[in-house]
């Protein structure tokens, strides 16, 4: 029996990506941009930088040749690593004017012996780019702004409006006929506020006015399914589906299924996984293994439009 061999993904990468997801990852300045991501550093990194920003010390690794190429315009043909260290540090600080209060303390030749993903900082301008790997991500997270809405997928959420609850027995429901009248709960009426649910969570009250809804206050209620009221929309639970295949079966095949039956998904072993949420296709990925468990690495996202 052959076993499915999947690409490996480390639990440390999952944890670091989850932490990074809370913070802004793209920054622009007049001459270029800075991107934060997570990747495993190459084993051949040979340059170490000691920096200080906003009172916090950072250690970064990069390729020495990439650093020299990034500084080419200021070197006037001189080899960067033959310059006095004081001049090297001054040139570096000149290139980081988009980060006020950044101080370059030291630069040296050194290798990085790390075999796990790290936070990566990629600087880009025109046709030049350089990547740095940071050994202390948590220290930087403490200084970063929260992730803006512009860096989020504009996934619409469903808000349902629910009137007061009416409890009926099973026999009463079964006996309902066209024209039957149910008594509304005491104290309710046409002008009573309605409770808005976000997903399956009570969220806020609205007042119906003609064809408009006026938001009149947050809900602090709970229900049987959700004992805690929803106070932070970032914690809204959303059911997500990961499809490795979708197939149409004829009625005979479907009703004849039994233990041992085989269904051809017509999907390659290393085929794509579809990511769906709220009935919308969000993107595609590939199956990976994370410490003996299945995971999905997202490869591309689809454009989500709100209609």
From Swiss-Prot:
Claim: Protein transport is one of the keywords in the record: yes
This protein's UniProt keywords: Plasmid, Protein transport, Transport, Virulence
Gene3D superfamilies to which the protein is assigned, alphabetical: SpoA-like
Record GO biological process: bacterial-type flagellum-dependent swarming motility; positive chemotaxis; protein secretion by the type III secretion system
Listed SUPFAM superfamilies: Surface presentation of antigens (SPOA)
Superkingdom classification of source: Bacteria
PANTHER family for this protein: FLAGELLAR MOTOR SWITCH PROTEIN FLIM (PTHR30034), YOP PROTEINS TRANSLOCATION PROTEIN Q (PTHR30034:SF6)
Protein name: Yop proteins translocation protein Q
Organism (species): Yersinia pseudotuberculosis serotype I (strain IP32953)
């Amino acid at each position: 029996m052959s076993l499915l061999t999947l690409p490996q993904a480390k639990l440390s990468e999952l944890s670091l990506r989850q932490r990074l997801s809370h913070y802004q990852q793209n920054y622009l300045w007049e001459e270029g941009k800075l991107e934060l991501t997570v990747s495993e550093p190459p084993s051949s990194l040979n340059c170490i930088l000691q920096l200080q920003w906003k009172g916090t010390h950072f250690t970064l690794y990069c390729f020495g040749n990439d650093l020299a190429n990034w500084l080419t315009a200021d070197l006037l043909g001189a080899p960067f690593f033959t310059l006095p260290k004081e001049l090297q540090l001054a040139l570096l600080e000149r290139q980081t004017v988009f980060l006020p209060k950044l101080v370059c303390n030291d630069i040296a030749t050194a290798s990085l012996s790390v075999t796990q993903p790290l936070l990566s900082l990629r600087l880009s301008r025109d046709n030049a780019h350089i990547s740095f790997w940071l050994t202390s991500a948590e220290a930087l997270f403490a200084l970063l702004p929260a992730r803006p809405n512009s860096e989020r997928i504009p996934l619409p959420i469903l808000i349902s409006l629910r009137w007061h609850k009416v409890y009926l027995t099973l026999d009463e429901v079964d006996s309902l006929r066209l024209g039957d009248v149910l008594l509304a709960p005491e104290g309710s009426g046409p002008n009573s506020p309605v409770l808005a649910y976000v997903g399956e969570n009570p969220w806020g009250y609205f007042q119906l006015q003609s064809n408009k809804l006026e938001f009149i206050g947050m809900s602090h209620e709970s229900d049987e399914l959700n004992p805690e009221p929803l106070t932070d929309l970032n914690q809204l639970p959303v059911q997500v589906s990961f499809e490795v295949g979708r197939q149409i079966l004829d009625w005979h095949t479907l009703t004849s299924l039994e233990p041992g039956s085989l269904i051809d998904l017509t999907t390659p072993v290393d085929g794509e996984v579809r990511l769906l949420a709220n009935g919308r296709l969000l993107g595609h990925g590939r199956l990976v293994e994370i410490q003996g468990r299945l995971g999905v690495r997202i490869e591309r996202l689809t454009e989500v439009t709100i209609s």
